[in-house]
From Swiss-Prot:
Compartment list: Endoplasmic reticulum membrane; Microsome membrane
Residues annotated as binding heme: H37, H61
Identification of the protein by name: Probable cytochrome b5
Principal location listed in the UniProt entry: endoplasmic reticulum
PANTHER family per UniProt: CYTOCHROME B5
Residue ranges of the TM segments: 105-125
Tree of life domain: Eukaryota
Membrane protein topology class: Single-pass membrane protein
Segments forming domain Cytochrome b5 heme-binding: 2-78
Biological source species: Neurospora crassa (strain ATCC 24698 / 74-OR23-1A / CBS 708.71 / DSM 1257 / FGSC 987)
Family: Belongs to the cytochrome b5 family.
GO BP terms, alphabetized: sterol biosynthetic process
GO molecular function: heme binding; metal ion binding
Length: 139
């Protein structure tokens, strides 16, 4: 699509029946997708007619979600003086390996802490049970 939109043009499309968003300076008509969005329509209506780059990236959408945007592309954003600055820069690499590596590293560390904490709790429980058994009077 070679159409160019200004922020003012995009801002006019801010209802459930006519919904445009800007993601990384690309304009998408997501009207037909509103009812299908896994996060619900409220999430999309909150960013209707606006630059939703930051909200889109904060959620950490999958590659499939990014691919689903392609057929909804209607043009590009034509920046003008006085327009708000983009809130989130375009990631230098959208490669799944780069994104997954960071998330996986954190996930493994988190699991390690949980497992070690569970083992420490179990060991403390066993120790206290043994101490209670040793100090209990015989009947």
């Amino acid at each position: 699509m070679s159409a160019e939109f200004t922020y003012q043009d995009v801002a006019e499309h801010n209802t459930k029946k006519d919904l445009y968003v800007v993601i990384h300076d690309k304009v998408y008509d997501i009207t037909k997708f509103v009812d299908e969005h896994p996060g619900g329509e409220e999430v999309l209506l909150d960013v209707a007619g606006q630059d939703s780059t930051e909200a889109f990236e904060d959620v950490g959408h999958s590659d499939e979600a990014r691919e689903a945007l392609e057929p909804l592309l209607v043009g590009t954003l034509k920046r003008q003086a006085g327009d708000p600055k983009p809130k989130a820069p375009l990631p230098s690499s959208l490669a799944p390996a780069a994104q997954t590596g960071t998330a996986t590293g954190l996930g493994i560390g988190l699991y390690a802490v949980l497992v070690l904490g569970g083992l420490a709790g179990f060991a403390a429980y066993q120790y206290l049970q043994a101490q209670q058994g040793a100090t209990a009077p015989s009947a």
